Amino acid sequence: MAAEDVVATGADPSELEGGGLLQEIFTSPLNLLLLGLCIFLLYKIVRGDQPGASGDNDDDEPPPLPRLKPRDFTPAELRRYDGVQDPRILMAINGKVFDVTKGRKFYGPEGPYGVFAGRDASRGLATFCLDKEALKDEYDDLSDLTPAQQETLNDWDSQFTFKYHHVGKLLKEGEEPTVYSDDEEPKDEAARKSD
């Protein structure tokens, strides 16, 4: 609005600017839509996605399974825990068996890493290969991995140790399983030798 228009209407310029902005927001359908969208997004950000706040239960998620007692597995015994035959999902990485059931969306039958469920995933994770053919059915000693692949595998091992419950170890053919007490946690080979 030009200065002559303001003088001609006899209105205070500060009143017109404030009223003009509010008037522009509330009279334009597009601006009302954008304002509503901004308020909705602000509400979602502040409120967040709080589970149980709406009162509905997520029927897709089964109730959590009780913690598995420590024990060792042969590759054949491990295969049962693929999320199909048994609701629990176990994976072996670097000789350690982890309960990854809480990561069902990733490691379950329909997940992107479902090929590793109930298997020794070490070779697949070390080589970034998601093909079932890359995994061995028997114990894999991983002796042919390059140093870079071994380092990648160690990174995966650390990540799984931090995130998932370590259940036991993967047994080589003819190896005797460790007998764990009910409250004992499985240890890796280095920790076991230092005791």
UniProtKB/Swiss-Prot annotation:
Supply the InterPro entries for this chain.
Cyt_B5-like_heme/steroid-bd, Cyt_B5-like_heme/steroid_sf, MAPR/NEUFC/NENF-like
**What PTM annotation applies here?**
O-glycosylated; contains chondroitin sulfate attached to Ser-54. Ser-54 is in the cytoplasmic domain but the glycosylated form was detected in urine, suggesting that the membrane-bound form is cleaved, allowing for production of a secreted form which is glycosylated.
Q: Which GO terms describe its molecular function?
A: heme binding; metal ion binding; protein homodimerization activity; steroid binding
Is Cell membrane one of the keywords?
no
In-chain residues carrying the UniProt-annotated modification Phosphoserine: 54, 181
Carrying Phosphothreonine, the residues are 74
Regions that span the bilayer: 25-43
Q: Which residues lie on this side of the membrane: Cytoplasmic?
A: 44-195
UniProt: heme binding residues: 113
Where in the cell is the protein located?
Microsome membrane; Smooth endoplasmic reticulum membrane; Mitochondrion outer membrane; Secreted
Under Pfam families, the record lists:
Cyt-b5
Report the superkingdom from the record: Eukaryota
Q: Which GO terms describe its cellular component?
A: cell body; endomembrane system; endoplasmic reticulum; extracellular region; membrane; mitochondrial outer membrane; neuron projection; neuronal cell body
**Among the record's GO biological process terms, what is one?**
associative learning
- List the keywords (alphabetical): Endoplasmic reticulum, Glycoprotein, Iron, Lipid-binding, Membrane, Metal-binding, Microsome, Mitochondrion, Mitochondrion outer membrane, Phosphoprotein, Proteoglycan, Receptor, Secreted, Steroid-binding, Transmembrane, Transmembrane helix
Q: How does it assemble?
A: Homodimer. Forms stable homodimer through hydrophobic heme-heme stacking interactions. Interacts with FECH; the interaction results in decreased FECH activity. Interacts with EGFR, CYP1A1 and CYP3A4; the interactions require PGRMC1 homodimerization. Interacts with TMEM97 and LDLR; the interaction increases LDL internalization.
Q: In UniProt terms, what function does this protein have?
A: Component of a progesterone-binding protein complex. Binds progesterone. Has many reported cellular functions (heme homeostasis, interaction with CYPs). Required for the maintenance of uterine histoarchitecture and normal female reproductive lifespan. Intracellular heme chaperone. Regulates heme synthesis via interactions with FECH and acts as a heme donor for at least some hemoproteins. May be implicated in 2,3,7,8-tetrachlorodibenzo-p-dioxin (TCDD) immunotoxicity.
Misc: Non-classical progesterone receptors involved in extranuclear signaling are classified in 2 groups: the class II progestin and adipoQ receptor (PAQR) family (also called mPRs) (PAQR5, PAQR6, PAQR7, PAQR8 and PAQR9) and the b5-like heme/steroid-binding protein family (also called MAPRs) (PGRMC1, PGRMC2, NENF and CYB5D2).
Please quote what the entry notes about the protein's domains: The cytochrome b5 heme-binding domain lacks the conserved iron-binding His residues at positions 107 and 131.
Q: What is this protein called?
A: Membrane-associated progesterone receptor component 1
* The organism of origin for this protein: Rattus norvegicus
Which gene name does the record give?
Pgrmc1
